[in-house]
Amino acid sequence: MPLRIPARFVALLFMTALAVACAPRTDVAQRPPPGYVGDVAPRVAAVDWTQARPVTVQLSEFEFQPNRLTFERGTPYRLTLENRGNVAHTFTSEGFFKAIAVRRVTTPQGPVETPALVNLEIPAGQTDVVEFVPVQAGTYELACHEPLHSSFGMTGAITVR
């Protein structure tokens, strides 16, 4: 005899999965995971944040503007991420996130002090600010990890010199 699953149960399961899939996915760790800059607090404390260089990246449907960023090691930056699109976008660069010491991430929900960034999701119409000091030189891939966004060209590169 075949198993019958009530339609309400299937609908509830689908709606729950959809809600979880659409939930904001900004991921930060309070302690640096392996591979991340480890001595963040003294590095960010040693910087004059009044001298932070402002950089703005606009996120919209399938592009970062600009999509190529260059930073200098040891220089403080205030990176403003403006989502001007109609859907959420991520600013994700695992290598870059491992190469910087983050002082603070500020979202409309408030600041998070000295986080280790894993993924930044910026909902439509939202602006997030990341204050950081680049530590390790290199060139790192940048992508939006929302479904198909990188396939449609929402990619870039970040260079630390």
Language-model features: locations:
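C-terminal motif of bacterial Sec signal peptides marking the signal peptidase cleavage site
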Residues: 18-21
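N-terminal edge beta-strand
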Residues: 42-77
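Extracellular/periplasmic metallocenter environments
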Residues: 23-38, 63, 114-161
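Short beta-strand and strand-turn-strand segments in soluble, beta-rich domains
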Residues: 107-115
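Beta-strand cores of secreted/periplasmic/IMS beta-sandwich domains, seen most often
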Residues: 67-92, 127-136, 160
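Bacterial N-terminal signal peptides that target proteins for export
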Residues: 2-11
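Short aromatic-acidic-glycine turn motif
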Residues: 97-108
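Short, compositionally biased
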Residues: 93-99, 146
